[in-house]
Amino acid sequence: DLGDHESIYIIPLSDVHIGEEGFNETLLDNIIKMVKKQDNLFVVLLGDLINNALKTSKSDVYTATMTPQQQVNYIVDKPKPIRHKILGSVSGNHEDRTSKDAGIDLSAVIAQFLDIPYDSASLVYQIKHGTKGSGKNNYVIYTTHGFGGGGSKGAKANKLQKLSELCLADLYVMGHIHDIVTFSDAVYVPDTRHDRMVLKKRTYLSTGSCLQYGGYAEKMLLRPGSEGYPLIHLSDGKVKIIT
């Protein structure tokens, strides 16, 4: 329950890539300041918070600006002023590199230091807000890091829509593709209390990154992604995406 706020805003923070040459520290600083200042603004973490370049990975260890340990230290210290407003975290493929090589889940370590809910694969949130007099608004939000490529908007949208095969939710959110893509659809669900079918709207969102263009993306001829993040706006039982 996020309190008596008439509306709620959530930043889906993903693909920060601390330790990468193109990491935009100013952008992260501004996000933390904004969350600290605004009472009804919260954060969900979607993985790849650190770049975690290893000798066995695609990332270049020689251009890294921090060691993996320094990256972990940075991300557990930086958001301390707002950690009570971080709703939870999932892991990304960059953190998973250490899980595969050494059996250490860096995302779990980060979540433990921040004292926030964590799952390596996905988290489902039941968000409630509003006053008792007007009734609480309820939303179900499914979050995961995501995987794979997909250069076109259509390919990215297809990846997003596949999330709806896993569970029924009001909003599906993923990261990984460094691009803001959003759309909605609808499906009929049974209302057994009233013996009817109800049309339910579902919203899909892939979020951006904290990474300036260059490095691996430029070498692989990938087009520039979305630097920055959308806002999830929850109000009156409706989901709106602000880009």
Name each model feature, range by range:
Residues D105-L106, Q112-L114, K136, V140-T143, ...:
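Extended, solvent-exposed, turn-rich assembly/linker loops in the middle of proteins
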Residues D1-I10, Y125-Y142, L199-R202:
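Beta-strand-turn-beta hairpins that frame and shape the catalytic cleft
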